[in-house]
Amino acid sequence: MKILVIGVGMYVTGRGTNTFGTIFPSIIEFQRINKIKKFEVIFAGRNFSNIQKSKKKVLKALKISKIDLSKINFKVSFYPNKKNKKQTYKDILKNEKNLSCAIVAVPDHLHYQVINECLDHDLHTLAVKPFTIKTKDARKLIEKKNKKKIFGLVEFHKRFDKHNLLLKNAYDSKRLGAPLSFIVEYSQKKIVPEELFKTWAYKTNILQYLGVHYVDLVYFVTRATPVRVLAIGQKNWLKKKGINTYDSIQCIIEWKTKSNIKFTQTLSVNWIDPNNSTAMSTQKIKFLGTKGNFESDQKARGIKIVSDDTHVEEPNPDFNMAFQEGNRTEWRGYGIQAITQFLSGVRKIKNKNFINSNYYNKSKEDEFFKYFNFSSTSFEEAAISTAVLEAANKSLKNNSNWQKIK
C-alpha cells in the first residue's frame, strides 16, 4: 500500500506545535494493526524547509511508537528532498507508480485544484474539510469521481465523536421530537491564524475553516436541507496584526427536514481565544426539540490537569490523544478513527479490485460505501456544507443579507 500525503503542516505532522498532528499518527496506528508487507508513505510539501521540519516530527513519531521496522515494513519518503529542488505533488502524481490513495491536507483555497489532480490520476482521495469553497467546484469533483469509479471522502471527524453520535441516536429515536434550533459556539486560540496559518489565514475565514464542521454535523444528524443563510462578521484584532480576515463570524442557517419542518442553526465562531486558554478548541452545542433538549460541552470532557510546569489544561482524550503503553506511544481517538477507516476502506476496495470491475455504479453506491464507517462523509454529502459556505460568504459581502442556498 502506497499513500500520498499532500501537505505537511500542523494537522499532518504537528509542525509548529509540541504534538505530532493527527494524520501521520493515524497512519502509524493503521499499519501497527494491519502489518501490511509493502507499506510506504510519501509526503509532499510546499518547500524543502517545511519538509525538513516535518521529517524530524515523522521520524520522532515512529521512534516513540516503537514500531519495529525490521518486522513491520514502514517506508517514508519526503519531497522536495533536496534544497533548491522544485519537486511538487504534481511530480509525484506523474512519476510515482502504484499509488493506492491520497490524503489532501492543504490550505482551504487549494482544495479543488489538488483534489481534482488526485482524481485525474485515479486515486481514492480523503480531503480535510472544507471540501471546496464553491458549489460548482464540488459538482465537478463529484462528477469526475463517479465517472472514474473511484472514491472520495471528506474528513469531517466531528461525525465520529461519541458526544455527537449520542445526539444522532437521540434524534433518530425521536426522543427529542421535531427540531427547533441548534446553537453552536466554537472557537480556537489566536496562535492558529497568527502563527500556524499566518501565510494563508487571509485567504480563508473562521466559518469555512472551523465552523463548517458543525454545518456538516447538523446535516449528519437530521438529513435536512439548508434553505437560506445570514452571516455577520467582525474584523478587528487580526486586521491590526496585518491579517485581513474575520476575528469572529455569527451565522444563522435555516434548514428544512424531509417532512417540511423548518428549524434554525445559530453558529458563533472565532479564532481569537487567548493562547493561555485551557484547550485549543472551545466547543459547545445545544439542540432544542419539541420533546426535549440535548447539550454537549465538547471542551470540558471532565478532565483538568494542573502542574508547576504548565498552566491549567483541559485535554480532550476523545479526539487524538497520545497514550503511553509500556515504553511505546499509541494514538487513539475519533480523529484517528476518521482517517484509519478511510485507509481500511481503500485497502478493502483495492483487494476487491472495484476500479477494474463493473461493480461500482450509482445504483450500488451503498454497497460500495459499506467498506467505510457509516459516519464517513462522501463528496456528495460534503457538498451540502460547501453550498452553505458559499451562501454565507455572499452574505458577508452583501451587508449580511439573507442568501438562498442552492
Where are these regions (language model features)?
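Predominantly a Rossmann-like dinucleotide-binding segment in NAD(P)-dependent oxidoreductases
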Residues: 9, 153, 158-244, 251, ...
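Contiguous beta-strand/loop segments that form the cofactor/metal-binding neighborhood of enzyme cores
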Residues: 209-310, 325-352, 364-369, 389-393, ...
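N-terminal glycine-/serine-/threonine-rich beta1-alpha1-beta2 phosphate-ribose binding loop
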Residues: 1-121
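Short, well-ordered amphipathic alpha-helices
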Residues: 22-32, 55-60, 165-171, 251-254, ...
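Glycine- and charged-residue-rich phosphate/anionic-cofactor binding loop of Rossmann-like
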Residues: 352-384, 404
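Active-site loop of classical SDR/Rossmann-like NAD(P)-dependent oxidoreductases
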Residues: 49-54, 329-340, 357-360, 380-384
